[in-house]
Amino acid sequence: MVNDLIPWVDKNFRTLLDKDHRAMAGLSMGGGRTATVTMANVDKFSYIGLFSGGAQIGGGRGRGGAAPGADPGTTPAPAPAATPAALDLKTIYNGQMADPAEFNRKVRVLFMSFGAEPPIENAEGLKRRQEQLIAAGIKNSYVYISPGATHEWQTWRRSLYTFAQLSVQRRGETTCQ
């Protein structure tokens, strides 16, 4: 991913070549993989979007495994339950969040979303996870709960719209380049 896809995109499309203009987002299982890849490469991504996969930040239940392009030693963070486990920033993702000020400097947006409808534990757990991140000093985390939707395209369309708007705002621009 990092060694092949980013150079290919930069070669074939008009892009700005720095991390401050690079985002990665994924939905469902792709959201989990996005978390794994971006957290292993916070020097390459400033905007991280986890659509119905935001549960990958922090403790709880989960599946494990590293994504292609991620450091195989990276410890992925499992999904939150309705009451997420305590958050240990020193151990998840090999400590990428251990220094909250440094993480906030590197990652401008950590966006997580779920649908509001059952299983409601996902949305409630995600809200609690964000509270834990903020309490631990991770200030650039954002949660969106899609009203009247579940694990479906409506949630993901709304999530992409919200993530894109937030990312442009956090970059301090009023329009996309």
Residue ranges, per PLM feature:
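Non-catalytic cap/lid and distal C-terminal segments of serine-dependent acyl enzymes
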Residues: M1-Q177
